[in-house]
Amino acid sequence: KEELTGLYKSRLIKIPFLRGMIILLDALLLGTRLLVLSANQQTGEEEKIEGPALYGTVGVSLVIGIGIFFVLPTLIAGGLEKIIETNSFVINFIEGIIRLIFLMVYVWAIGKMPEIHRFFAYHGAEHKTINAYEAQVELSPENISPFPLEHPRCGTGFLLIVVVISIVVFALLGPLDLIWRILSRILLIPVIVILAYEYMRWTANHLSNPIVRMLVFPNLWLQKMTPREPSPDMLEVSSMALK
């Protein structure tokens, strides 16, 4: 059990847009540490990965993710631009669709891995437990089990929001040379991530609105590919973790 970092207790966490970057960076580091801890427990290793090794793991993961989901679609769209005679808006839109396809294929592919299947089951337990907690019911496996696997603030849905917002932002940039196009994709990632966080936060606070529920539907639909039905012991773990 760890105390929240000082940033969570500062005024910075209340500033719109800035809070998104703080929370997401902290969640990335915490998530990496927990995945490493889980892997060590399964293999029986007690060696901790922290400090430079932890930040190095996060750094390499970010570089690979940016390369696959941002740079590669831009290169493919740039190649198509030489074949298809059209305007920059259409090319940027095609690039966004390629990025969306990459995301869906990635989520589908990792879901087929046995190790990730168990991870997704714990993810489902997490969602069910949070749904139960927000419904103000007693947190027990029996009470948690009937709740849905999907949750409007899921990280998978967040990735979808990032992709959709990137389509809009990049389409507004207009025509750019390939090098500048690639640089713009990389440099604007923090802006897109912050906008995505604020959008998700806003929709989560307005779910009683039927229009907002329609906007959230694609997020929930994509989660059909990630959370899995958890076992009772997984629900027990998730309920104890939240308590």
What are these regions (language model features)?
Residues 1-59, 88-92, 98, 102-145:
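Large intracellular
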